[in-house]
């Protein structure tokens, strides 16, 4: 079985320790016992539901942290559980070993018999079963990974180090159970194995849409790992599907990661409304890792080529404040447009609406001596409960402070979502869980302003995508091997 290991969470990819599978026992006449052998743990946690599947890593009907072993085992005991033959328990467990956490995920166990307090199989009348009769006490879903390293459960109260915490607790929180230590590495991927094997990233398969409406479709084939780097390349739709395919239809529904039945998964060309003529890719940690507050470091080489721009983002996992027009915000970690005339301008920061002037109100710029896409650079975004700091190669170039809240300025610009942010903290909408996403976009109706002299389309025009495609003899020659977005590593630290 392939296993993963991390500092704090799921995501430093090396072979490592595997949490022991739990043994579940139905006690006669009443009760449930769950245990694992003591292998030097400092904590054991059990979370489960009776006859109801778990929703991810929820607490469950049973939610207990055990801090001491007994007779060589860590034991959870519910003396009031009234179980019967055929009942099914869905569960996950968690252990801490040598300061790192490990989970047994997606556990399923069906009551097939009972034991007494000593663990001897008994019948429903309470008499001991004759030795030799088979008795099954534990079962796992074989299709699911059994052990995924992570950090200790976050439903534990904050305790000082003297009461069991080995560190100063962080302001950061994460999407999987765990206390977080200040400065601790939460996530790391150095892209040493294919994306699908790590099972950390989800490649998007869909047509991106509002509010930016880029002129590309995301397909998984255009993201690959090569020589320790993530490579995302642009390619024409015709290179994959044939000449003039932009005037056909493309149905991604069977593997679409967007909303099936919408334009995210199915497009049909009609007159001047052609299909997005470029294929790119986007990957995200949406299903595996999200966090609130931390420092993101990404070493990347930006793409060269007209009308290309990278999307290196933090995106909201739950869209608490709304879905449309970035109502729940996005954080640009770094972006550089691929056109030569823009390649010395690095920009990043928070975006909270789809259109200017407020869209770019908080974006910060760093004008380089040379083009940012000539080489790899270290791009950093530090996200705190009181603001955001942007750095490149260790040098700060931007600071964003919310003041009394982002609402005040947004409301003066008549941003529709602004009143929703009053429900949160002064950092709203940036006070919820966000995940990491990395992608490549082409053109669209927001990133390139109308005053660019050689731009072949108007953002507001119905024929915008067609005009872009018809001008390919102008921009396509600027694309080559350097037009790929290359990422060396991604790291997320607690603050």
UniProtKB/Swiss-Prot annotation:
Residues 135-149 have a biased composition (Polar residues). Glycosylated. Residues 118-162 are annotated as: Disordered. Changing residue 30 to A: Increased binding affinity to curdlan compared to the wild-type. Changing residue 70 to A: Decreased binding affinity to curdlan to less than 80% of the wild-type. Involved in the recognition of invading microorganisms activating the phenoloxidase cascade. Binds specifically to beta-1,3-glucan. Binds to both curdlan, a linear water-insoluble beta-1,3-glucan polysaccharide, and laminarin, a water-soluble beta-1,3-glucan polysaccharide containing beta-1,6 branches. This is Beta-1,3-glucan-binding protein. It comes from Bombyx mori.
């Amino acid at each position: 079985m392939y296993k993963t290991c991390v500092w704090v969470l799921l995501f430093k990819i090396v072979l490592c320790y595997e949490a022991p599978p739990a043994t579940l026992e139905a006690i006669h006449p009443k009760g449930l016992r769950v245990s694992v052998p003591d292998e030097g743990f400092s904590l054991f946690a059990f979370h489960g539901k009776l006859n109801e599947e778990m929703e991810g890593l929820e607490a469950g009907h049973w939610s207990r942290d055990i801090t001491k072993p007994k007779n060589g085992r860590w034991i959870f005991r519910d003396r009031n559980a009234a179980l019967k033959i055929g009942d099914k328990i869905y569960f996950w467990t968690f252990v801490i070993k040598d300061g790192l956490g490990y989970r047994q995920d997606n556990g399923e166990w069906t009551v097939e018999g009972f034991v007494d307090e000593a663990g001897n199989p008994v019948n429903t009348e309470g008499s001991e079963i004759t030795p030799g009769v088979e008795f099954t006490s534990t079962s796992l879903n074989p299709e699911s990974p059994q052990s995924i390293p992570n950090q200790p459960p976050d439903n534990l109260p904050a305790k000082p180090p003297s009461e069991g915490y080995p560190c100063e607790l962080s302001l950061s929180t994460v999407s999987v159970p765990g206390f977080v230590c200040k400065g601790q590495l939460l996530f790391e991927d150095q892209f040493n194995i294919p994306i699908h094997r790590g099972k950390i990233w989800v490649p998007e398969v869909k047509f991106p849409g509002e509010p930016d409406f880029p002129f590309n479709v995301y397909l998984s084939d255009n993201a690959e790992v090569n020589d320790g780097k993530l490579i995302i390349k642009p390619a024409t739709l015709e290179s994959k599907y044939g000449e003039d395919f932009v005037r056909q239809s493309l149905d991604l529904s069977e593997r679409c990661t967007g909303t099936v039945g919408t334009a995210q998964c199915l497009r049909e060309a009609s007159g001047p409304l052609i299909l997005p003529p470029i294929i790119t890719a986007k990957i995200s940690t949406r299903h595996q890792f999200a966090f609130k507050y931390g420092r993101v470091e990404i070493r990347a080489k930006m793409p060269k080529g007209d009308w290309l721009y990278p999307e290196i983002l933090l995106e909201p996992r739950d869209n608490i404040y709304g879905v449309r027009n970035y109502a729940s915000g996005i954080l640009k970690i770094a972006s550089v447009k691929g056109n030569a005339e823009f390649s010395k301008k690095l920009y990043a920061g928070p975006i909270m609406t789809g259109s200017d002037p407020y869209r770019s109100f908080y974006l910060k710029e760093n004008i380089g001596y040379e083009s940012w896409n000539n080489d790899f650079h270290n791009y950093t975004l530090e996200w705190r409960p009181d603001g955001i700091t942007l750095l490149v190669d260790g040098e700060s170039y931007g600071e964003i402070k919310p003041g009394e809240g982002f609402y005040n300025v947004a409301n003066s610009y008549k941003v529709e979502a602004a009143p929703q942010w009053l429900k949160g903290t002064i950092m709203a909408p940036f006070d919820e869980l966000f995940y990491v996403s990395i992608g490549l976009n082409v053109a669209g109706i927001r990133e390139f302003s109308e005053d660019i002299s050689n731009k072949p389309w108007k953002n507001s025009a119905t024929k915008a995508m067609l005009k872009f495609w018809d001008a390919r003899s102008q921009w396509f020659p600027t694309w080559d091997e350097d037009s790929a977005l290359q990422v060396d590593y991604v790291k997320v630290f607690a603050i």
